[in-house]
C-alpha cells in the first residue's frame, strides 16, 4: 500500500493538468479566466473544477472567474512545487537515461543527485554531469545526500527487492516504472507507472466500435 491521502486521488491527478493549463495561459498573457472557459480548455466540467478547487479554499470570485497568476501560484504551493526534492534513478538503461535527460523535472524542483545500476560497464558514465554508480552503494548515498524520491527503472525481477532496500534506507517516495505493482509500507508514497496502460487504452479505443458491433450482433443462448 501507499501513503493515504486526505483529498481523493482523482482530484490530485487533475491538479497537475490545471497547473499545466494555467502555465500556458500565463505564457499567452491571459490574466483571468472563467470556470466555463477553463472547462473548455481542460475537457472537465466547470462544476468539477469548482469542486476540485474548493478542496483547497476555492480561489474563484463570482462574476470575475479566476485570477490566472494567483491560481497558478496557489496550485504551485499545493503541489509542493515551491520546494526542491533530491532524487535518484535506479536503472541507467534507455528509460533511466531518458528521464535523467529530461530537464523539465529539474526546472520544477526535482534535483537529480545520483544514478545507479548493476552493470559495471555503465559505472562512471555521466548523464548531465551526474555519474552512474554501483547500486550496492545506494544506501550509503541516500544517507549522505538526504534523498527524497527514488525513480525505479529496472526489470520487474529485481524491483520489489530494490524497493525494499530503498525503503529500509529511508526513502519516503518511489516513482516506479518497473512493470510490476510494488508493495511498500503505508507511510511510503508510491506511484506505479505502467507505460503500456496508455497504449492499451488507445488500442481498445481503436477497436471499440468494432467490438460493440460484434456484441450487438451476438445472440445469447439459454440452456434448457
From Swiss-Prot:
Listed HAMAP family: Rex
Keyword terms of this UniProt record: Cytoplasm, DNA-binding, NAD, Repressor, Transcription, Transcription regulation
Keyword Ligase: no
Name of this protein: Redox-sensing transcriptional repressor Rex
Molecular-function GO terms, alphabetical: DNA binding; DNA-binding transcription factor activity
Single biological process term from Gene Ontology: negative regulation of DNA-templated transcription
SMART domains reported in the protein's UniProt record: CoA_binding (SM00881)
Amino acid at each position: 500500500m501507499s501513503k493515504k491521502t486526505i483529498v481523493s486521488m482523482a482530484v490530485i491527478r487533475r491538479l497537475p493538468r490545471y497547473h499545466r493549463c494555467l502555465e500556458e495561459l500565463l505564457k499567452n498573457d491571459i490574466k483571468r479566466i472563467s470556470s466555463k472557459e477553463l472547462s473548455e480548455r481542460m475537457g472537465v466540467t466547470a462544476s468539477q473544477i469548482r469542486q476540485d478547487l474548493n478542496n483547497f479554499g476555492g480561489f474563484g470570485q463570482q462574476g470575475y472567474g479566476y485570477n490566472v497568476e494567483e491560481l497558478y501560484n496557489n496550485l504551485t504551493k499545493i503541489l509542493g512545487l515551491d520546494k526542491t526534492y533530491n532524487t535518484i534513478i535506479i536503472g541507467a538503461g534507455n528509460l533511466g537515461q531518458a528521464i535523467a535527460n529530461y530537464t523539465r523535472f529539474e526546472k520544477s524542483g526535482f534535483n537529480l543527485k545520483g544514478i545507479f545500476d548493476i552493470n559495471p560497464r555503465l559505472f562512471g558514465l555521466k548523464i548531465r554531469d551526474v555519474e552512474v554508480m554501483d547500486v550496492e552503494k545506494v544506501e550509503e548515498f541516500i544517507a549522505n545526500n538526504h534523498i527524497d524520491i527514488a525513480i525505479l527503472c529496472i526489470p520487474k525481477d529485481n524491483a520489489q527487492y530494490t524497493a525494499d532496500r530503498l525503503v529500509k534506507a529511508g526513502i519516503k517516495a518511489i516513482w516506479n516504472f518497473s512493470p510490476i505493482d510494488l508493495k511498500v509500507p503505508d507511510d511510503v508514497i508510491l506511484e506505479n507507472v505502467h507505460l503500456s496502460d496508455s497504449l492499451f487504452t488507445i488500442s481498445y479505443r481503436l477497436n471499440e466500435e468494432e467490438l460493440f458491433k460484434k456484441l450487438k450482433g451476438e445472440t445469447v443462448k439459454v440452456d434448457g
